[in-house]
């Protein structure tokens, strides 16, 4: 079953763009950057006009992990007294790591919930193919640390575009919260109609996720240096290193922050 996405409404939302930029910058602040790089941050983001292709492979009850975090919040007084009912345009995006792995059957780390569920709770396992025209602009300072530290500082502007993602993901709705997590990547010659999730056998799938999450199939990076001498090869080599660093960082962020058993969360939906 395929889903039609009102991508124009999502892509034109300033609130969503701001949340994504803030989230990316928060992640970049936590990344250990090379000594030749400083002040790296996202300056703008456009989601483009191409909507992702979404196909539902399984519908069922949300994983217990999503309820466990809800119970933890209730125990610490973090729950929303009004059930988080706020305007969708102001829904905060959070990152969460599953904290229930020691309470779950090791042979079935992602099992559907058998309790706690609210009346409208549900979960979709979806195939997402996103051949995008997204554009992310990043600014940074390129440092030349010879003959002294920060001897020269040059502004660098980078544009990330042509992102291609093909993945199996879980989207769960639990008590006015939406959880999104990537389960595994999908190769272009893989028969997703016969995937484990389509038959509901998520136990077999869960054992593969750690080694299979590499959802970025393509990412183009273009760079522009503020000023440099044409014959200064060391600077040009450093720019190439920045491009490689950014691509690796994006790949790692998706795996570490959104790959199961981690997820991002939208509240007040």
From Swiss-Prot:
Family: Belongs to the MDM12 family.
GO molecular function: lipid binding
Organism: Komagataella phaffii (strain GS115 / ATCC 20864) (Yeast)
Residues covered by the SMP-LTD domain: 1-269
Topology term for the membrane: Peripheral membrane protein
Locations listed in the record: Mitochondrion outer membrane; Endoplasmic reticulum membrane
Name of the protein in question: Mitochondrial distribution and morphology protein 12
Domain of life where this protein originates: Eukaryota
Role this protein plays: Component of the ERMES/MDM complex, which serves as a molecular tether to connect the endoplasmic reticulum (ER) and mitochondria. Components of this complex are involved in the control of mitochondrial shape and protein biogenesis, and function in nonvesicular lipid trafficking between the ER and mitochondria. MDM12 is required for the interaction of the ER-resident membrane protein MMM1 and the outer mitochondrial membrane-resident beta-barrel protein MDM10.
Ranges for region Disordered: 72-119
GO biological process assignments: mitochondrial genome maintenance; mitochondrion-endoplasmic reticulum membrane tethering; phospholipid transport; protein insertion into mitochondrial outer membrane
UniProt free text on domains: The SMP-LTD domain is a barrel-like domain that can bind various types of glycerophospholipids in its interior and mediate their transfer between two adjacent bilayers.
Name of the encoding gene: MDM12
Bias type Polar residues, positions: 88-114
Main location: mitochondrion
CDD domains with a match to the protein in the record: SMP_Mdm12
Keyword terms of this UniProt record: Endoplasmic reticulum, Lipid transport, Lipid-binding, Membrane, Mitochondrion, Mitochondrion outer membrane, Transport
Subunit organization: Component of the ER-mitochondria encounter structure (ERMES) or MDM complex, composed of MMM1, MDM10, MDM12 and MDM34. A MMM1 homodimer associates with one molecule of MDM12 on each side in a pairwise head-to-tail manner, and the SMP-LTD domains of MMM1 and MDM12 generate a continuous hydrophobic tunnel for phospholipid trafficking.
An example Gene Ontology CC term for this record: ERMES complex
């Amino acid at each position: 079953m395929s889903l039609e996405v009102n991508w124009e409404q999502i892509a034109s939302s300033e609130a969503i763009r701001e949340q994504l930029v803030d989230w990316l910058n928060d992640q970049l602040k936590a990344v250990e950057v090379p000594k030749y790089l400083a002040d790296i941050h996202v300056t703008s983001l456009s989601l483009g006009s191409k909507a992702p292709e979404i196909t539902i492979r399984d519908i069922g009850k949300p994983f217990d992990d999503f309820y466990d975090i809800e119970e933890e919040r209730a125990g610490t007084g973090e729950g929303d007294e009004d059930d988080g009912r706020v305007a969708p345009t102001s829904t905060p995006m959070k990152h969460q790591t599953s904290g229930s792995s020691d309470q779950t059957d090791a042979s079935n780390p992602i099992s559907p919930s058998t309790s706690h569920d609210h009346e409208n709770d549900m979960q979709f396992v979806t195939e997402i193919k996103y051949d995008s025209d997204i554009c992310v602009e990043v600014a940074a300072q390129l440092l030349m640390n010879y003959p002294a530290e920060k001897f020269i500082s040059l502004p660098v502007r980078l544009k990330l575009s042509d992102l291609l993602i093909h993945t199996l993901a879980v989207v769960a709705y639990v008590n006015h919260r939406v959880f999104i997590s990537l389960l595994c990547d999908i190769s272009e010659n893989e028969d997703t109609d016969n995937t484990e999730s389509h038959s509901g056998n998520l136990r077999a799938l869960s054992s593969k996720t750690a080694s299979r999450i590499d959802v970025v199939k393509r990412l183009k990076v273009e760079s522009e240096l503020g000023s440099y001498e044409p014959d200064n090869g060391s600077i040009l080599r450093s720019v190439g290193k920045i491009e490689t660093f950014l691509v690796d960082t994006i790949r790692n962020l998706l795996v570490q922050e959104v790959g199961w058993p981690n997820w991002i969360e939208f509240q007040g939906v």
